[in-house]
Amino acid sequence: MVTIRADEISSIIRERIEQYTREVKVVNTGTVLQVGDGIARVHGLDKVMAGELVEFEEGTVGIALNLESNNVGVVLMGDGLLIQEGSSVKATGKIAQIPVSDGYLGRVLNALAKPIDGRGEISASESRLIESPAPGIIARRSVYEPLQTGIIAIDAMIPIGRGQRELIIGDRQTGKTAVATDTILNQKGQNVICVYVAIGQKASSVAQVVTALQERGAMDYTIVVAETADSPATLQYLAPYTGAALAEYFMYRKQHTLIIYDDLSKQAQAYRQMSLLLRRPPGREAYPGDVFYLHSRLLERAAKLSNELGEGSMTALPIVETQSGDVSAYIPTNVISITDGQIFLSADLFNAGIRPAINVGISVSRVGSAAQIKAMKQVAGKLKLELAQFAELEAFAQFASDLDKATQNQLARGQRLRELLKQSQSAPLGVDEQIATIFTGANGYLDSLEVGQVRKFLVQLRTYLKKNKPQFQEIISSTKTFTPEAEALLKEAIQEHIELFLQQEQA
């Protein structure tokens, strides 16, 4: 028979009493009143902050956006199919933030920075707020270094600098994404981290972009943040801020970054959907009153940091889609007024076979030649003016039957210059190649060729120059100026190659 030892039992009880710690936990909770269309109305949550993350009983997370006197409007970051009326909600005390680290390079993520490429988790020891304040006036310095896109028309006439915000605007299917991805490809070896944010795109389009970047080895320095068309509106709205937070992580570590938002029209539509469902009053085109702030607080985060902060930079290329070339619609005018210039892509030019379909006349860069190396300024100075005059003359020439010789020559030169700006997709050019191409056209060396021969001649000239005059590239990359020596080498190469080319064509 087992004997009961009172002293042993009392010592166990005493030990348990000594170990007991009384912990009072105050949890800010609420009850779901109504749920549907990605929105939940919650009663309670008295001390919740605007933008705070809240967690539902079944695990879905949401953001408290509307704080009203008798309920809280929460937007859901998931489908919320298991949330029921009367289920409990608790405030987390946290504002939306994401983990950040170098491990994100080469990966495809969603708006919550979770990998969606099936290559496992990413370890990160640091985190950043998705919405963080933009650098102030003292923290910045003016833009002065070029960010080469590899596209002649842009680098010569609408130059982009590190820390600039340049809008890419145009109708659907005019090559906006192609301009952005070519810019990413051209950053290879330039020590620039790229972030591509796809908002509301088809999953097949995003897969196409990722494949193109992988094939050319560009994913090594690129992060893709994707929320496709079937994602909840909340996540489409958050995706650009997630991309900006990742780019900022590198910017504040003295690195140069490039971020592409493809596209902000879809983000504005997702935000409009959320706002209307939250019963916020609609404004112009049914967008809410703060849609300008939606984009301005995002784009102001792009900056060129001061010397004290390490001179890192974040260059933003937002994309906006227009309907039949209407630049005066609400979202396009908003983003044009926030950015430092725009690249306008025209459907008419695209259909006429001029690709990239950049309308040079109404595209501008408000940073201008400050974002060009001296060699490019020397060569491309007159190019934009000549092309603008050519466009005017061409329109006039349609009505005039007999033109004088000077006008005919100017038209012929203009046609060749336009041909010179055509470029294949995924074939960005180095600065030295661009300088050689522009110099050849602007100085009349192409005038003796047929318009149809220009592109073939220029491709062969660039190869010939690389092979036979490697000093040209060395001079441009080391001195950043178009020296008399470089000019002599280039002229020599052009003369030699024109003879060779004409012999080949006649043969």
From Swiss-Prot:
Compartments where located: Plastid, Chloroplast thylakoid membrane
Membrane topology qualifier: Peripheral membrane protein
Residues at the site labelled Required for activity: S363
Pfam families, sorted: ATP-synt_ab (PF00006), ATP-synt_ab_C (PF00306), ATP-synt_ab_N (PF02874)
GO MF: ADP binding; ATP binding; proton-transporting ATP synthase activity, rotational mechanism
Enzyme Commission code(s) on record: 7.1.2.2
Positions with a binding annotation for ATP: G170, D171, R172, Q173, T174, G175, K176, T177
Reactions this protein catalyses: ATP + H2O + 4 H(+)(in) = ADP + phosphate + 5 H(+)(out)
InterPro entries: ATP_synth_asu-like_sf, ATP_synth_asu_C, ATP_synth_asu_C_sf, ATP_synth_F1_a_nt-bd_dom, ATP_synth_F1_asu, ATPase_a/bsu_AS, ATPase_F1/V1/A1_a/bsu_N, ATPase_F1/V1/A1_a/bsu_N_sf
Record SUPFAM superfamilies: C-terminal domain of alpha and beta subunits of F1 ATP synthase, N-terminal domain of alpha and beta subunits of F1 ATP synthase, P-loop containing nucleoside triphosphate hydrolases
Known partners and oligomeric status: F-type ATPases have 2 components, CF(1) - the catalytic core - and CF(0) - the membrane proton channel. CF(1) has five subunits: alpha(3), beta(3), gamma(1), delta(1), epsilon(1). CF(0) has four main subunits: a, b, b' and c.
Described purpose of this protein according to its UniProt entry: Produces ATP from ADP in the presence of a proton gradient across the membrane. The alpha chain is a regulatory subunit.
Name of the featured protein: ATP synthase subunit alpha, chloroplastic
Native source organism of the sequence: Lemna minor (Common duckweed)
Taxonomy of the source species: Eukaryota, Viridiplantae, Streptophyta, Embryophyta, Tracheophyta
Gene that encodes the chain: atpA
